[in-house]
Amino acid sequence: MLDSFGHADLLGAKVMRVVSSNRIYRGEPHGPQLERLKAQYRQAVDVAKRYGIRFAVENHLDYSADELLEILEAVDSPYIGITFDFGNFVRLGEDPVEAMAKLGKFVYATHVKDLRVNEDAPQEEWYSYSAVPIGEGFLDVPRLLRMLKDAGYTGLLAVEIDCLHPAYHHDEDAAVAQSVRELKRLVQGLS
């Protein structure tokens, strides 16, 4: 990860998304992982300062909102924040609105999406909540956007379609285009 700051700098990035783990593939307890991450992220803060680039840990099907908050509070630097993925907290059994209430002031980047239950997928699989265009799922995207604005977020709103719901009968490009239109409409309504 430390070498990636140089790449981000070459691109002119001011925020770099990072992923810490993935609960699906990790069998070890989270306590030791969290302690290692805190130490690694403290080192990363020094590199981030040198480059003037903040890094944003995504809730990538790995850590709960409380665990992420624990990391942020332990590292205690403006150079570390969150990439808030609107759907990934649901996939861990958490409410994204409650997660936003805890983490909103730390959001440096976003993955905006909407989800629908995929009845054909095994319930324990992450894709049992499959992506649909924004506005066609069950996530309270308008409320999450309002919470982001109220927290002072001024960064990008990146649409992410990760695993299309089988009932959506268009391709990913169509889902992204539809999502962008809806996201623009929702953002205009925040003014």
Residue ranges and their predicted role:
Residues 1-81:
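Active-site acidic/histidine proton-transfer and metal-coordination neighborhood
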Residues 2, 8-11, 41-48, 83-90, ...:
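Short, basic, helix/turn surface patches
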